[in-house]
Amino acid sequence: IEDEVGEHPYGVDLIVPAKYEGSDEGGLTVHKIADMIPDAHHEYVNEILEKYDVPELAETKSGQFSMKNDGAAPMSAGTAGPQLEIALAHNPSLVVNALGPPPQFMIDQVKEAGRKVGALAGKAQHAERHVNAGVDLIIAQGYEAGGHTGEIGSMVLIPEIVDAVEDVPVLGAGGIGRGRQMAAAMTLGAQGVWCGSVWLTTEEAETHPVVKEKMLQATSSDTIRSRSRTGKPARQLKSAWTDEWENPETPMPLGMPLQPVLINDAIARINR
């Protein structure tokens, strides 16, 4: 990143949910999570892959994280700690947490390093909890946003959060891809905007070219909030994968982080 942006400021976002399987213990290992997954869900994932003739992975390949070690499960405090250390070894100006208030260790380490810390919020109550935890700014992320998002639209959410947190800076997020939307967010009281999905189609993004093209061709009706990727509602492009998990006669997606562990290799096969 620093090779690309030079001395310009940049930020890093991590995901440590407020609630997830094993959160009371700081997160479970991949092996323990894998042991909790019902056989019916494994069978269903295999049925989907067979239905669409998705090729097997090579023996030397694996998904986003290794299933052969006993490391911390994804999207947990156990994985965020090392990620934070790597981030702070560089020069991000801002570290942001999603799906809950940043853990205290994150706030302490970021502030000790002289950086700012923020958090995404889908409700005014979430924003208030973030401020009480000690964050420096709030990202008010509306229903329209890509990725993990709540159920309140940006037009309503942004002013609610601005009013709730008073003097804490608020960035508006969710459905912001043009200057008009940026102007609207700032008219609602936000001091700036936070964009995510719009960057996935840039030349610098690592997004697969096929996915980039699908995103560029998509309309506002071509997305869905689905738990099929992470176990929590996340907006993504509609696909055969999301269609299969929306079928009421099939198993419901598991919670986080069981669902990511369940589909780890499957997503790698699909992306290939």
PLM feature spans:
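Active-site entrance/lid segments in N-terminal catalytic domains of soluble metabolic enzymes
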Residues: 1-165
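Glycine-rich Rossmann-fold phosphate-binding loop(s) that bind the pyrophosphate
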Residues: 99, 173-174
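Acidic, glycine-rich active-site loops and adjacent beta-strand->loop/helix elements
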Residues: 18, 143-144, 175-176, 198-199
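Conserved active-site-proximal phosphate/metal-binding subdomains
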Residues: 27-45, 151, 156-171, 177-272
